[in-house]
Amino acid sequence: MSAEHQDPRGERLQKVLAHAGVASRRRCEEIIAAGRVRVNGRVVTTLGTRVDPEHDRIEVDGRPIESTPPLYYALYKPTGVISTVHDPHGRTTARSLVSTEERIYPVGRLDRDSEGLLLFTNDGPLAQRLMHPRHEHEKQYYALIEGIPTNQALQALRRGLVLPSETRPLKAETQRLPAAWHWRGHRAPQGCRWLSIILREGHKHQIRRLLQATGHQVQRLIRVRMGTLMLGDLEPGQGRWLSPSERDALRASAGLGTREAER
């Protein structure tokens, strides 16, 4: 399959094979390189070839891979839990809190000390759209910080700050919430304040680093929205399957069509 015939919006072939249960991602790369994979009748040996598992016929050793139905699961990741599928150090992973054995993966990450909405799916095109900075999908957070930011500090966050190791300004659409505002009954202690923050790109520890640059330490950080998907009334450690309307709205916001999901 030549590069000009690839769909740039598709998924990498080795990832599709791994999600279909053929083998591990590394082993799938070896299978591709050995010439054992055909896409629409053509042998593919180039790693990174992009395919559409919904429309392309993919075969390994002459056998078509089984198409896995798309799955979408929302989890309230608690603090102290890492946003990975496996951890070599034996720490609790977000994946271990998901009540299914299906192969679904987290979309992006939340810091270990952060909490809130984490989406799991096997919908590769959706995950790619939600994570890639150029698509500018909104993610909303509530942050409890030490101190009360000035209007000048809030304006600086909205305009963007150049942080160490960054080459361009990072922005955060930040609003100071009323002193009486609370997150599920938890009001800001004296000398602290809750903020509402919206990001349209994601860099490591972006919110914590930006607020630290304005002189404020983050005590608590909660993600409550990813695009059109809301955390809702989930409690820490709880999860749920997305409704068809939630799934379709999320895909539509990412510029994708609807898909028939298993749940």
Q: PLM features: residue spans?
A:
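Basic, flexible Lys/Arg- and Gly-enriched helix-loop patches that mediate nucleic-acid binding at interfaces
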Residues: S2-R263
